[in-house]
Amino acid sequence: AYEIRLSLVGSEMSIRDRDIERLGCKVWGLELFGRRSNQTLRIYIDKNEGISVEDCEKVSKHVSKVLDTENDFSENYMLEVSSPGLDRKFFYNEQYKDYLNEPLKVTFFDSQNKKTIQGRLEEVDKSSIKLEMKEGPMQIAFSSIIQANLII
């Protein structure tokens, strides 16, 4: 189990994975964006059987309660809870290993250039992924990945 801590409009909150697991789901990832006075917290949840509207509603109610009661948020915020979708974005290195041999789109820094490539996920180790492409294999360090998504 892990704990995710983030700063939202000047206050700190934590979302414990075990709390979401008690609701039958796991946290796939978090995004925080928007202006300071009107931020959006997007939480992606997942489970083996797929996510239902009811799952999103349960998690949303739980997280809203945490935001509204355990923290003093004086600014407006919007909470979104959803499935990561078929073209899911990867948030954590551990997520890649379940998608071996699947096609990925990866945006990363190569030296000082930003590149986007597509290939089949061939290998995952502690520090990188290996994609098989038409031009041959390419190893990409996790530290250089900006964003990676499944291709549907």
Question: What residue ranges belong to the model's regions?
Answer:
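Short Lys/Arg-rich amphipathic alpha-helical segments
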Residues: 11-12, 16-118, 122-152
